[in-house]
Amino acid sequence: MVRVGIVGATGYGGAELIRLLAGHPHVEIASLYSSSSEGDGLEKSFPHVAGLGLPTLSPIDADSMSGVNDLIFLATPAGVSSTLSPKLVEKGVKVIDLSGDFRLVNGAVYKTWYKHEPAPSQWVEAAVYGLTEWNQEQVAGASLIANPGCYPTATLLALLPLMKTGWVQSNSWIVDAKSGVSGAGRGVSLGVHYSETNESIHAYKVASHQHTPEIEQELQKQSGEETLVQFTPHLVPMTRGILVTAYGQLTADVTQVQIQELYEATYADKPFVRVRPAGSHPHTKEVYGSNYCDIAIHVDQRTKRVILLSVIDNMMKGAAGQAVQNMNVMFDLPEKTGLPLVPVYP
């Protein structure tokens, strides 16, 4: 059994990890940590987990974590993991970090976009970017995983197959993304109050969202050339789900059939990416509660653009689900273990 601890157990990401790990056949939830509810049972914050026999919440302390956990999930705000993760890894504990602290290779870029001091460079270099479908071999041997952001996951899985083909101008990508409000976390914020979000949709952090450089960095790794992305996120009045619509300018006379075949071949052995039939229109409802990313390809021959549609559950493939997928790979377990294979519908 893999003994796991969860730091940030009283947030949405922590709660979703508990939902998955409580039923995982190879996991024992050994410890839960919170900076605000020490000594409480988690059911005080989340009544829906009552009866699971979970440990009470403990204070966050690296020294006490090392003896009882094989792996720690860090579902914490930016700036926390950068100091805690190195201490844990040095004590022999593997770490999967759900924050952005180890995703960006360039410390100056991190500071610009996240407004925090970056993690020590040697630890950023040691971290593996946990987009499982593209970095599975590296994930398997890692001690520190930078779990990708929700928007980057939906975007990168859609765009990456095209980045080495030369079929699309690398700087032409426009990414329109829409997310449910759970992506903002559980903290109180005016922007996610019911009366503010119900029957409304709005863009936010236009040209300034911190996931922008993460997307560009990973695309550039595949293309080998500087890649800029116009990324605009929107908040929509639903709890879970992300829909990405990405537009790229074609540079070659390729057909939708060719691109469809490329994607089907790329993801043929990837259990959590479903390439939908040509011309499909995936709904977020069709991946709700699951670890799937559904992708559909369209080509507008009139404008010579490829249009990619990608949907995920932001709490699952965009956060906790992908983290559990990475854990499975790290501990040489079947990749799908403990992850629901049928989305919740309707």
UniProtKB/Swiss-Prot annotation:
The active site is at C150. The keyword Plastid does not apply. GO terms for molecular function: N-acetyl-gamma-glutamyl-phosphate reductase activity; NAD binding; NADP+ binding. It comes from the Bacteria. The keyword Amino-acid biosynthesis applies. InterPro entries: AGPR_AS, AGPR_type-1, NAD(P)-bd_dom_sf, NAGSA_dehydrogenase, Semialdehyde_DH_NAD-bd. SMART domains: Semialdhyde_dh. It catalyses: N-acetyl-L-glutamate 5-semialdehyde + phosphate + NADP(+) = N-acetyl-L-glutamyl 5-phosphate + NADPH + H(+). Gene3D superfamilies: Dihydrodipicolinate Reductase, domain 2 (3.30.360.10), NAD(P)-binding Rossmann-like Domain (3.40.50.720). Keywords: Amino-acid biosynthesis, Arginine biosynthesis, Cytoplasm, NADP, Oxidoreductase. GO terms for biological process: L-arginine biosynthetic process. It holds the Pfam family Semialdhyde_dh. Coiled coil: none annotated. Its main location: cytoplasm. It is found in: Cytoplasm. Its EC number is 1.2.1.38. Pathway: Amino-acid biosynthesis; L-arginine biosynthesis; N(2)-acetyl-L-ornithine from L-glutamate: step 3/4. GO terms for cellular component: cytoplasm. Belongs to the NAGSA dehydrogenase family. Type 1 subfamily. Catalyzes the NADPH-dependent reduction of N-acetyl-5-glutamyl phosphate to yield N-acetyl-L-glutamate 5-semialdehyde. HAMAP family: ArgC_type1. NCBIfam families: argC. This is N-acetyl-gamma-glutamyl-phosphate reductase. It comes from Brevibacillus brevis (strain 47 / JCM 6285 / NBRC 100599). The lineage of its organism: Bacteria, Bacillati, Bacillota, Bacilli, Bacillales.
